[in-house]
Amino acid sequence: MLFRSPDNSKSRGQYLPMLEMAVDEEPFNARNLYYYARELFFHKDYLAAKLVFEEYLKYTKYPGEKSYALRYLAKCDPHNAEKHLKESIKTLYCREGVLALANHYYITKEWKKCFKVSLEAMQIKTRLNDFMSEEWAYGPMAYDLAAISAWQLEQWDDALRYGEMALEMSPNDERFINNVKFYRSKVDELHLRSDGG
């Protein structure tokens, strides 16, 4: 399997006009549309990226790339983010997509959904065997989101348990260290009360 790495010695600025020209020459080429939309996204031209991603979705056949494009589209079109993220998961069920949805619920403060979807993400152990596999999805994020949402739902023991799991995966993360101290103090306080202390 070949993996392409960007040439960091060259400016990204040259890619956009080249991709635009490629799309002008072959407007139905899904691969060109995908890379053009992605480059527009990197240049923070979210409206243009949204339109090109929507065009790309009409022609693509590759589920991995389509799922990834839908996650980009969710960022370009935040009012419809949940719809795009659910479609991404339906297109290709993977930890990256499920965690993106959990993170959306974290951003929108939908704590029950965030907790449920974070737990679902934890169950996905198999990594994608292509360039769509992303390291961050297999780190502490699912456990951190579960801990935060459990805290918001006043599920103190769950907050501590998942907070400790996040910390175990990233033991030097200051936020995780502080969160676990915070969660533990709440759990200890409740246990003291229940013991009549």
Task: Please name every model-derived segment.
Residues 36, 72-73, 101, 146, ...:
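Structural register within alpha-helical repeat arrays
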Residues 27, 61, 92-93, 126, ...:
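Short coil turns that delineate tetratricopeptide repeat
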Residues 29, 33, 66, 94, ...:
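Residues that mark the junctions of alpha-helical repeat units in TPR/alpha-solenoid scaffolds
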Residues 40, 70-73, 77, 105, ...:
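Residue at a conserved register position within TPR or TPR-like alpha-solenoid repeats
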